[in-house]
Amino acid sequence: MRLCDTDIERYLDDGIISLTPRPNNDKINGATIDVRLGNSFRVFREHSAPFIDLSGPKEEVSAQLESVMSDEILIPEGEAFFLHPGTLALATTLESVKLPANIIGWLDGRSSLARLGLMVHVTAHRIDPGWEGKIVLEFYNSGKLPLALRPNMVIGALSFEVLSGEAKRPYSSRKDAKYKNQQSAVASRIDEDKE
C-alpha cells in the first residue's frame, strides 16, 4: 500500500521514515514528498577509455571505472552545474533518507524537468527497505540545450510503500551492500558484485 500525504507526515513525525533535513509539510503532496538537489556531482571524463568490460576481471573493471570517473565536484550555493545534451552525470539529493525494514521507497523525477529532456534517475529508482543515506541521481540530458542545475532546487519526489512484512535482508544489514550510508555522488561499484 502506497502511503498518502497524511501517513507520510505521520511517519516522519513518529521517526518511522527519516529525511534529513526534513522538508516542510508543504512539500508533501498527495502521495509524495519533494526532494532537492545536493551539491555533489561526478561526471565521465571524455575519451579516457575505449570501453568498460562489465564482465571482465574485477581488477580491470576497477581500473577502467577509476579512469573514466571524475573526482567529486562540489557546487557552491548559488552556482550551477551545467548538464550538456547527451551527457550523463551523477549527483545526490540534499536529503539523507532512512527507511525501516518494512518500507520501500520510489524516486520519480519531475514532469516539468522531463519535458526539458532531463532524466533524473536513469533506471534505478527503488530505495530498498533498510536504506540509509543520500540518494544518488543518474542525470541524463536528452534535450537539445544545456541545463543549469542548482543545489537546493526541487529535483524529484519520493513515495513510500509498506511491505507485507519486514524484509529478512534489509539493505542496512547486508554485508554486500555497496552503497551503504553514501553521502556523495558515489560512482558505480559494479566491480564489487558477487558472482
From Swiss-Prot:
CDD domains: trimeric_dUTPase. GO terms for molecular function: dCTP deaminase activity; nucleotide binding. It holds the Pfam family DCD. Keywords: Hydrolase, Nucleotide metabolism, Nucleotide-binding. The active site is at E138. GO terms for biological process: dUMP biosynthetic process; dUTP biosynthetic process; nucleobase-containing small molecule interconversion. DCTP binds at R110, S111, S112, L113, A114, R115, D128, V136, L137, E138, Y171, K178, Q182. Residues 169-195 are annotated as: Disordered. Its EC number is 3.5.4.13. Pathway: Pyrimidine metabolism; dUMP biosynthesis; dUMP from dCTP (dUTP route): step 1/2. The keyword Ribosomal protein does not apply. The keyword Lyase does not apply. Gene3D superfamilies: 2.70.40.10. It is an enzyme of class 3 (hydrolase). InterPro entries: dCTP_deaminase, dUTPase-like_sf, dUTPase_trimeric. Residues 169-179 have a biased composition (Basic and acidic residues). It catalyses: dCTP + H2O + H(+) = dUTP + NH4(+). Homotrimer. PANTHER family: DCTP DEAMINASE (PTHR42680:SF3). Belongs to the dCTP deaminase family. Catalyzes the deamination of dCTP to dUTP. This is dCTP deaminase. It comes from Haemophilus influenzae (strain PittEE).
